[in-house]
Amino acid sequence: MPFSVAHMERIEVDQEEVLAHENWLKMLEVQSHAGPCVTGFRLLKPVIAFGFVPIWQGVAEAWMVGSADARKYPITMTKTGRAVMDIAKISMGLHRLQITVRNTDKRAESWAYAIGFGQESVMKKYGPDGEDYLMMTRF
């Protein structure tokens, strides 16, 4: 379903990197206008959202916000994550798709590998809280 910030008001977000942004809902609203984004539902409840911000021709950065409910279905979420990334890459004509992952969030890093991303670099003090982040890419 097309993304709406109202969906996020119904998701129990526990991602430290999202919550570190004081106005994270406003940030998502702005990003949602920059490129395609969708919300995934289970039993009429939003559980995950994906978005893509074009940087320039052929390159975009993806974002994802998930709920604790989404983690109850790891196989489904991983297959969905791969499919959404594939669809975005094809439909947007991308030769590079990138994400940032908080360096201390090993669960998110592992999931990024599972959906086809590889580590490119460490971005020192990149986060809003001064934490290091990984730049991960998918070609």
Where are these regions (language model features)?
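Short amphipathic alpha-helix that is part of the acyltransferase structural core
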Residues: 1-24
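Active-site rim helix/loop that mediates acceptor-substrate recognition in acyltransferases
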Residues: 18-37
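Charged interaction scaffolds used for protein-protein
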Residues: 31-34, 41, 57-59, 80, ...
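Conserved beta-strand in the GNAT
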Residues: 39, 44-54, 60-63
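Conserved acetyl-CoA binding element of GNAT-fold acetyltransferases
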Residues: 58-78, 134
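Conserved acetyl-CoA-binding loop-helix of GNAT-fold acetyltransferases
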Residues: 73-89, 110, 114
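Conserved beta-strand-loop-alpha-helix junction that forms the acyl-donor binding cleft
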Residues: 94-113, 126-127
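Conserved catalytic-core motifs of GNAT/GCN5-like acyltransferases
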Residues: 100, 118-133
